[in-house]
C-alpha cells in the first residue's frame, strides 16, 4: 500500500511509527458508539505478529477488512504464525497495555478518528492520494535542508 510505496520512494529518509487506535469500544474508551467490532482483537494480534516480524504483513490483511475471528486465524496461519503462541500473546495484559498506551498517545495528539498520518507533526487525515503524501514529505525534506 501507500506506506510501502513511500518507503521505496524515500529510502532511508522516512521513519514509520504505527499507533493503534482501534475503533472498538471493547478497548477504546474514547468511542461513543461501536464502529469496528473485533478491532481490539485485531490490534492485539498485530502487536503479537510484530514480535515475530510480521506486523506489516498481518496489518495489510487486517486493513483489507479481515478482522472477524475466522479471518484473523486464517491470516495468522497464512503467515505461519503459531496459533497457540499468538493466542497466548493476545491474552497477555502486557499486549493489551501496548494497545491502551497507543490509544492514550493518539488521544493526547487529538486523534479521534483514523486514518491519520503525522508527517513531522503535520496531520494528514483520512485516506489520501499518494501525490498528497509526496507533496507534504517533499516540503518537510526541503525544510530540513
Functional labels for PLM-detected ranges:
Residues 1-77, 143:
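Structural alpha/beta surface segment adjacent to cysteine/selenocysteine redox centers
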Residues 1-10, 14, 65, 70-145:
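C-terminal cap of thioredoxin/glutaredoxin-like
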Amino acid at each position: 500500500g501507500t506506506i510501502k510505496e513511500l518507503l521505496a520512494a524515500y529510502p532511508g529518509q522516512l521513519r514509520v511509527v504505527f499507533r493503534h487506535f482501534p475503533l472498538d469500544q471493547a478497548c477504546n474508551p474514547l468511542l461513543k458508539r461501536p464502529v469496528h467490532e473485533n478491532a481490539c482483537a485485531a490490534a492485539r494480534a498485530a502487536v503479537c505478529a510484530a514480535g515475530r516480524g510480521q506486523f506489516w504483513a498481518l496489518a495489510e490483511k487486517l486493513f483489507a477488512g479481515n478482522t472477524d475471528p475466522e479471518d484473523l486465524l486464517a491470516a495468522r496461519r497464512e503467515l505461519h504464525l503459531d496459533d497457540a503462541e499468538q493466542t497466548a500473546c493476545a491474552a497477555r495484559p502486557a499486549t493489551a497495555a501496548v494497545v491502551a498506551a497507543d490509544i492514550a498517545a493518539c488521544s493526547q495528539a487529538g486523534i479521534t478518528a483514523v486514518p491519520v498520518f503525522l508527517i513531522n507533526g503535520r496531520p494528514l487525515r483520512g485516506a489520501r492520494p499518494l501525490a498528497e503524501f509526496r507533496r507534504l514529505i517533499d516540503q518537510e525534506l526541503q525544510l530540513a535542508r
